[in-house]
Amino acid sequence: MDWMELLKAVILGMVEGLTEFAPVSSTGHMIIVDDLWLKSTEFLGKYAANTFKVVIQLGSILAAVVVFKDRFLELLGIRGRHPGGKPRLTLLHVIIGLLPAGVLGVLFEDYIDEHLFSTKTVLIGLVLGALLMIVADRFAKKAARAQTVDQITYKQAFLVGLVQCLSLWPGFSRSGSTIAGGVLVGMSHRAAADFTFIMAVPIMAGASGLSLLKNWQYVTVADIPFFIAGFLSAFVFALLAIRFFLHLINRIRLVPFAVYRIALAFIIYFLYF
């Protein structure tokens, strides 16, 4: 086993875990780490490399499941709802939020993969996503109607789902677009973040599962240690990142992440253009 290649797998998993759920664009970071430094997945071959990227994303998804496990058990009816008759987030809220991007993603998947995954489009997505986040913070309602995820209405869920369609453009960031959208339609930053992460699990798991089925046959036994290392690294760092982000979001809001995204866009611009 090549320990340097194993370290590359761990580093890529770390980058995926730290950035997948933060509103900073995991795609933008993977461009820098993968293309400019590691050339990380060359040792796996093209098709196994695609599978590796899916596997480390599954590590991030598992971290979100762990953080929100009680909520998912409740949504699926495995655990009973809290008494008191207060409004609660339902599975229907999640489905409504997923529909717009889910439908567009299925219809335009091939076009997006073939025409939108480039350094230039990611650069554009980083900047436009940052501007959306700045606008969201600027016009955020001081007294948000939905202070917690359980106070989100079906209308708000649908509107957030519409804004999530922007994340189909690489670099825009799923969490960045949906949290900004949630804030703009009257959610607190924490409520929007909770709803974003809960919605992300089924849509990411579905997309990753399909991709895994398409590419798994290209993986060899020798690749397995790298997949395990990347998966575990992504899981651990995503777990830390999600908990840290949720703890901070109501206090620091979105502008610091927007500034970071613009700085990242400048770095990519000067490195590539």
Swiss-Prot record:
Key words, A-Z: Antibiotic resistance, Cell membrane, Cell shape, Cell wall biogenesis/degradation, Hydrolase, Membrane, Peptidoglycan synthesis, Transmembrane, Transmembrane helix
Catalytic activity: di-trans,octa-cis-undecaprenyl diphosphate + H2O = di-trans,octa-cis-undecaprenyl phosphate + phosphate + H(+)
Statement: the UniProt record of this protein carries the keyword Transcription regulation: no
GO biological process terms on file: cell wall organization; peptidoglycan biosynthetic process; regulation of cell shape; response to antibiotic
Enzyme Commission number, as recorded: 3.6.1.27
Origin superkingdom: Bacteria
Keyword Cell membrane: yes
Pfam families in the record: BacA (PF02673)
HAMAP family referenced in this protein's UniProt entry, alphabetically: Undec_diphosphatase
Protein family: Belongs to the UppP family.
Transmembrane segments: 48-68, 89-109, 116-136, 152-172, 193-213, 222-242, 252-272
Protein name stated in the entry: Undecaprenyl-diphosphatase
One of the record's GO molecular function terms: undecaprenyl-diphosphatase activity
Function: Catalyzes the dephosphorylation of undecaprenyl diphosphate (UPP). Confers resistance to bacitracin.
Other known facts: Bacitracin is thought to be involved in the inhibition of peptidoglycan synthesis by sequestering undecaprenyl diphosphate, thereby reducing the pool of lipid carrier available.
One Gene Ontology cellular component: plasma membrane
Recorded topology in the membrane: Multi-pass membrane protein
InterPro entries documented for this protein: UppP
Protein location: Cell membrane
Main location: membrane
Gene name per UniProt: uppP
